Amino acid sequence: MSTTNLLEFDRDGLADFCARLGEKRFRATQLFRWIHQRGASDFDAMSDLARALRDKLKGCARVQAPPVISGQASADGSVKWLFDVGAGNAVEAVFIPEDERGTLCVSSQAGCAVGCRFCSTGHQGFSRNLSSGEIIAQLWFAEHALRRRLKTEDRVISNLVMMGMGEPLQNLAALLPALRVMLDDHGYGLSRRRVTVSTSGVVPMIDRLARDCPVALAVSLHAPNDALRDQLVPLNRKYPIDELLQACKRYLAHAPRDFITFEYCMLDGVNDQIGHARQLVELVGRAAIRCKFNLIPFNPFPASGLLRSAHDQILAFAQVLGAAGIVTTVRKTRGDDIAAACGQLAGDVRDRTRVAERMAKQRTMQLQLQLNSSRRAEPSAAGVIGCGESI
């Protein structure tokens, strides 16, 4: 007999489910607390629920995360789990412990259709959106697994970032109920300031998120001009930088923070020159947008054909931004020994969009162009990419 996974529901949805069982809607709050605050999956353990309700639930419902294929711990304390979401697809979630907080990085899709050049997930293509339950299950499993491991009843995960596999705003219908569970005081009680949705720039959905469930927003910028961003983040061809920045300004009217975080992956010789930093200063100044920059050292993977910027170059880049009064941080790479760092999450994806095939063809063409160019160019000029030039 088919049963309903209660992880799929926010509290209102769970109240509707209880009403369909002939139960009072307030029972949903009791049930919701058992599931999310206590991590219970056994209805018999839910001692303050009436026996009749528990018997009904056993016949028609379940509380179940996707099967865990593997769990890996990094030398720095980060933990990565690989979840089997069926049909040959697997997604990853990563816990990153720090002195004052514990952050969980959560996936929203099996694969990603955006196809950013520097992202391992994008090179795998796209299979499907995750359901609300599959998104929240990553938090449900991680929080309670970590509590058991640490032998504590205190909350372990204080921050959550939608920065795992997938573009969250291309799965907004499932994302919104999951966010409501994260924020619900009867669920995980996370602050809106401590839940961050990262997007490559789906402009209409930024506006919808602002209206329906504003949380902290991070934008994957990665380039100071459209010519370069078109190459690194193909979605830019649909929603160019000026449109994106205007959407960010509109978002700030609803956001729990008074700034937007711009993520910027530092790619050697591609987007990391001092001229690029000066262009960024001019860009955000012209847009008059309150922001901070998070510079991310690139985590190489074979298919990318890209290299990490030198540490001194990253610091020099940050200094230009900082001198202009822009708060700038350099992300500390965590979990790279278990392929859990930024841009490395890949899981397993059964590509239904042929994105991976197209990207492979593009890589072949780029390599051929580079070979042809190097044969024609002077040795000292080969392979150099100037500020603002496309790749």
Curated annotation (Swiss-Prot):
The gene is rlmN. Pfam families: Radical_SAM (PF04055), RlmN_N (PF21016). The active site is at 92 (proton acceptor), 342 (s-methylcysteine intermediate). GO terms for cellular component: cytoplasm. PROSITE patterns: RADICAL_SAM. NCBIfam families: rRNA_mod_RlmN. The lineage of its organism: Bacteria, Pseudomonadati, Pseudomonadota, Betaproteobacteria, Burkholderiales. Reaction proceeds by a ping-pong mechanism involving intermediate methylation of a conserved cysteine residue. It catalyses: adenosine(2503) in 23S rRNA + 2 reduced [2Fe-2S]-[ferredoxin] + 2 S-adenosyl-L-methionine = 2-methyladenosine(2503) in 23S rRNA + 5'-deoxyadenosine + L-methionine + 2 oxidized [2Fe-2S]-[ferredoxin] + S-adenosyl-L-homocysteine; adenosine(37) in tRNA + 2 reduced [2Fe-2S]-[ferredoxin] + 2 S-adenosyl-L-methionine = 2-methyladenosine(37) in tRNA + 5'-deoxyadenosine + L-methionine + 2 oxidized [2Fe-2S]-[ferredoxin] + S-adenosyl-L-homocysteine. It is found in: Cytoplasm. Specifically methylates position 2 of adenine 2503 in 23S rRNA and position 2 of adenine 37 in tRNAs. m2A2503 modification seems to play a crucial role in the proofreading step occurring at the peptidyl transferase center and thus would serve to optimize ribosomal fidelity. Binds 1 [4Fe-4S] cluster. The cluster is coordinated with 3 cysteines and an exchangeable S-adenosyl-L-methionine. It comes from the Bacteria. [4Fe-4S] cluster binds at residues 112, 116, 119. Belongs to the radical SAM superfamily. RlmN family. Disulfide bonds join 105-342. Its EC number is 2.1.1.192. Coiled coil: none annotated. Keywords: 4Fe-4S, Cytoplasm, Disulfide bond, Iron, Iron-sulfur, Metal-binding, Methyltransferase, rRNA processing, S-adenosyl-L-methionine, Transferase, tRNA processing. One of its GO terms (molecular function) is metal ion binding. Gene3D superfamilies: 1.10.150.530, Aldolase class I. Residues 98-337 form the Radical SAM core domain. This is Dual-specificity RNA methyltransferase RlmN.
